[in-house]
């Protein structure tokens, strides 16, 4: 999978993909002190960046993880967090890399469709840029 991260295209890592991305770019993911399963509330950090554009600052997402990213890798910033997981979402705007600990594809993630639409728009902007 590492070869995909060398491509010059936007990439969205979800759950284990988020953790893999953190490892690839120089940080480790490890066992979560408090694994999360089911609905959880995340809070955006700042405006949440382009991935969370048009979504509220607090939202319900679906979690299913024993491991987590505890600190973002160099060049990445935290764009969403929760009480039990500091890095619910991260981004590196320069590389167009985004990681989500939660599952936007699950219906229980309130604004999952918006997140995917925003990612498609990020891809379109990268293609035209």
Predicted regions and their residues:
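Short aromatic/basic micro-patch
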Residues: 36, 63, 101
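Cysteine-nucleophile active-site neighborhood
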Residues: 1-54, 60, 113-117
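Acyltransferase
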Residues: 101-129
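Active-site glycine-centered loops adjacent to acidic/histidine catalytic or metal-binding residues
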Residues: 15, 65, 103
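Catalytic cores of nucleotide-enabled group-transfer and carboxylate-activating enzymes in metabolic
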Residues: 4-8, 20, 90-106, 122
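Catalytic beta-strand/loop cores that center a nucleophilic Ser/Cys/Thr
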Residues: 48-95
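Conserved hydrophobic/aromatic beta-strand scaffold that supports enzyme active sites
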Residues: 39-41, 87-89, 99
């Amino acid at each position: 999978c590492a070869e995909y991260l060398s491509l010059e295209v936007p990439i969205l890592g979800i759950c284990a993909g988020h953790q893999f991305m953190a490892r690839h770019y120089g940080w480790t993911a490890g066992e979560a002190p408090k694994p999360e399963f089911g609905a959880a509330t995340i809070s955006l950090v700042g405006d949440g960046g382009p991935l969370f554009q048009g979504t509220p600052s607090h939202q319900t997402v679906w979690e299913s993880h024993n491991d987590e990213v505890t600190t973002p890798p160099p060049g990445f910033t935290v764009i969403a967090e929760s009480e039990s997981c500091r890095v619910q979402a991260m981004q590196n705007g320069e590389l167009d890399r985004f990681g989500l600990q939660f599952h936007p594809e699950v219906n229980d993630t309130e604004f999952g469709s918006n997140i995917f639409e925003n990612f498609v728009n990020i891809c379109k902007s990268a293609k035209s840029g």
